[in-house]
Amino acid sequence: VSICCLRKHEEFGGTLITELIYVHSKVMIVDDLYAIIGSANINDRSLLGKRDSEIAILAEDCEFIDSRMDGKEYQSGAFSSSLRRRLMKEHLGFLESEQAAQDSLVDDPISESFFKDVWSSIAETNTSIYEKVFHCLPSDSVQSFDDLPQYKNLQGLATTDLQEARKELKNIQGHLVNMP
């Protein structure tokens, strides 16, 4: 299991800044066969039907393509699998790289090699770089409220060495980071 979030950075007026990306849309892709896309939150306000106006669709594929799941041949839905691949490529930073190489990296989303060598590796590398450059909160380095004041007194490269910070940020791939 991997709990991740998305983060990005920019330079604004000569200052490097970063923030977690807040995604308000809700998407669940099941087995590359079904996609639920909507706006409802899992709370009474959204689900009781008396307050918020919410909408969602269930897209059940009826066209199938040859695919792989956990190293085995699999018939996945054309729409659901293409949506999953597109989102994964965006989050992993593969949209700008060569098409043939990137497609194969996200073909089998439940294989051990994808999880360790691609997903976890990119999330860990990005998390480490952001930690070094921005000294982000929340952080796994802060284990208790007692740790917080000391952590907040430390500065990242964005404050202490702008050139080195820019150099480090060039190694960020996509937006995927580990959730602390």
Language-model segments: which ranges?
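Long, C-terminal catalytic modules of enzymes
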Residues: 1-180
